[in-house]
Amino acid sequence: MTARALSELVDQGWAQALEPVREQVAQMGEFLRAELAAGHRYLPAGANVLRAFSFPFDQVRVLIVGQDPYPTPGHAVGLSFSVDPEVRPLPRSLANIFTEYTADLGYPQPSNGDLSPWAQRGVLLLNRVLTVRPGTPASHRGKGWEAVTECAIRALVARDTPMVAVLWGRDAATLKPMLTGSACVAIESPHPSPLSASRGFFGSRPFSRANELLTQMGAEPIDWRLP
């Protein structure tokens, strides 16, 4: 991640929303450069670290929270749960998300694991921690990203416009106290990982439930269809 002004790296709405943590973002850039200097790589690629904030702040209607990026080289792309179109096989959590997507919405299995169409339609795919060392899950937790992503979530809630937060798993559920705005609703289920998907993620209907809630609040539902 380069040492550029925040306004050059993210959507202008997000640049304003993240102004309270602008210095923290700069410090995280310094942390990543120190990692590289010490011989440690990080994922995703620098240009994608803040990718979730490249889509319009004012258009976010659904928030899907991840923990930290995929630690497998070639998988992390800066959007929670998403991978590049050519990645095969899919990460198992994403495969389970697609199983539920098909069961919930009746759409065919997507042709690849690229979730960027969702991001373009108002879904913020946000990891709580935005980087990770390759092969070492959770290695960048507690380093400072949480302050940035929690600021982002508070800014979304403060807009007071309809938003549904989809919280998968215990880690995401800890954010629920922040999601208390009059126009914000949270839906929870177990995580889609193979360890917990059968304990209540399958059958949770997150996509149709999110759209039902958006419609009830007078907002446009999400077009969840993927190619």
From Swiss-Prot:
Its main location: cytoplasm. The keyword Chloroplast does not apply. It comes from the Bacteria. Disulfide bonds: none annotated. SMART domains: UDG, UreE_C. CDD domains: UDG-F1-like (cd10027). The keyword DNA damage applies. One of its GO terms (biological process) is base-excision repair, AP site formation via deaminated base removal. It is found in: Cytoplasm. Keywords: Cytoplasm, DNA damage, DNA repair, Hydrolase. The active site is at residue 68. NCBIfam families: PRK05254.1-1, PRK05254.1-5, ung. Belongs to the uracil-DNA glycosylase (UDG) superfamily. UNG family. Excises uracil residues from the DNA which can arise as a result of misincorporation of dUMP residues by DNA polymerase or due to deamination of cytosine. This is Uracil-DNA glycosylase. It comes from Mycobacterium sp. (strain KMS). The gene is ung.
